[in-house]
């Protein structure tokens, strides 16, 4: 790829598992909170959601759905459609049909929020997590997380969640999705098991990284068995400290996990791993940021290249995400640091993003205030313009 111009690598074909892509501009999963409430804790994809995904679909392009709760007990946000009721499956089928009509591919991102919820979202139930450590601050419903600390999951409950992921993957295929992405990052349930500062278990699912990785590997095996490894990916975020997660040694610990993923039998090995790039403002705590700024010292940002290399040995593709722009996206591919690039915010405000990037058309700026719901719901959702 070294002889190509900066953006050309984004528009070369790529095969990831079962998916033959015509370009490498992937739509990242973006929670938008615009689905219809059917009953307490249950939101269903609606016609506006169909329009949103259809707008952003492209021939041979890969889309990742917004994070989608696998069960009633997995939810923690309003307006987010799940994949656990017949009406949700039917609603998603309209979305996937619309994407396929435009020649696109779409995967369902399977989600369990773990402790990132409150009883108000769970019909009064106590949130489940690896340990009884609550998130600091308030939830979206205004309740303080610490007022209802999570209950540590029993081993039987962990096994049940593994089965729920597998069952949800089958429902996703029933709804017309081309495959699934397991959400293993951003401080949600699987990430809570992985980070040693919020997992203080002393059984087979806590302590060593071998134990903390166990549920992730079990879910990968269960989901790949359910729908086929070539239709499965997983998202991880070792350096992005969402919701109080902060591991003591991400490079070592996620290095172990990636080596294990790459070493899985072919029938259980996911087609890709999707990772979020480290950011300066997230990898340092507040005192470290102040020290670095006061002394003007150079901060060496951790790299995902070692993790990418481990996965590549097993033939596992790598999708990179995290504040990519036209200026730096192609370079990531030219240096073989990733196979494809996932764009989130730019896809929100540019429904025709692949075309704009390919033709050098000016990008529309996004409005952060409309990311998570708006009045009317079309605002900042389906009203961004296409290029002329």
Curated annotation (Swiss-Prot):
Q: Which domain of life is it from?
A: Eukaryota
Q: What does this protein do?
A: Flavin oxidoreductase, part of the hnx cluster involved in the purine degradation. The nicotinate hydroxylase hnxS accepts nicotinate as a substrate and catalyzes the first step of nicotinate catabolism. The major facilitator-type transporters hxnP and hxnZ are probably involved in the uptake of nicotinate-derived metabolites, and the oxidoreductases hxnT and hxnY in the further metabolism of 6-OH nicotinic acid.
Oxidoreductase keyword on record: yes
> What EC number(s) does its UniProt record assign?
1.-.-.-
Q: What is this protein called?
A: Flavin oxidoreductase hxnT
> Which molecular function GO terms apply here?
FMN binding; NADPH dehydrogenase activity
Q: Does Oxidoreductase count among this protein's keywords?
A: yes
Q: Which SUPFAM superfamilies match?
A: FMN-linked oxidoreductases
Q: Which Pfam families match?
A: Oxidored_FMN (PF00724)
**Class of enzymatic activity (EC top level):** oxidoreductase
């Amino acid at each position: 790829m070294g002889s190509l111009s900066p953006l050309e690598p984004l528009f070369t074909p790529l095969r990831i598992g079962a998916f033959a892509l015509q370009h490498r501009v992937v739509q990242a999963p973006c929670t938008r909170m615009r689905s219809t409430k059917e009953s307490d804790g249950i939101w269903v994809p609606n016609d506006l959601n169909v329009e949103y995904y259809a707008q952003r679909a492209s021939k041979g392009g890969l889309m990742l759905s917004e994070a989608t709760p696998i069960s009633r007990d997995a939810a923690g946000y309003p307006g987010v459609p799940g994949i656990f009721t017949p009406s949700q499956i039917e609603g998603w089928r309209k979305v996937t049909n619309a994407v396929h009509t435009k020649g696109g591919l779409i995967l369902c991102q399977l989600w369990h929020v773990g402790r990132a919820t409150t009883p108000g979202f769970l019909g009064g139930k106590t949130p489940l997590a690896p340990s009884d450590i609550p998130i600091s601050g308030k939830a979206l419903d205004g309740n303080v997380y610490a007022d209802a600390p999570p209950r540590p999951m029993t081993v039987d409950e962990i096994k049940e969640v593994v089965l729920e992921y597998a069952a949800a993957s089958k429902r996703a295929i029933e709804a017309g999705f081309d495959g699934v992405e397991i959400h293993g990052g951003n401080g949600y349930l699987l990430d809570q098991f992985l980070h040693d500062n919020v997992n203080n278990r002393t059984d087979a699912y806590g302590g060593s990284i071998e134990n903390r990785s166990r549920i992730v590997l079990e879910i990968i095996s269960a989901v790949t068995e359910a729908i086929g490894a070539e239709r499965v990916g997983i998202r991880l975020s070792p350096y992005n400290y969402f919701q109080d997660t902060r591991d003591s040694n991400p490079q070592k610990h996620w290095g172990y996990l990636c080596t294990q993923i790459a070493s899985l039998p072919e029938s259980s090995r996911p087609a890709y791993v999707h990772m979020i790039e480290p950011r300066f403002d997230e990898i340092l705590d507040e005192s470290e940021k102040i020290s670095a700024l006061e002394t003007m010292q150079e901060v060496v940002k951790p790299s995902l290249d070692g993790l990418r290399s481990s996965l590549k040995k097993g033939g596992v593709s790598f999708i990179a995400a995290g504040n990519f722009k036209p200026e730096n996206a192609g370079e990531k591919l030219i240096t073989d640091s990733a196979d494809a690039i996932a764009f989130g915010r730019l896809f929100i405000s540019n429904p025709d993003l692949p075309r704009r990037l390919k033709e050098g058309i000016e990008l529309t700026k996004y409005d952060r205030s409309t990311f998570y719901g708006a009045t009317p719901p079309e605002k900042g959702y389906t009203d961004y313009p296409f290029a002329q």
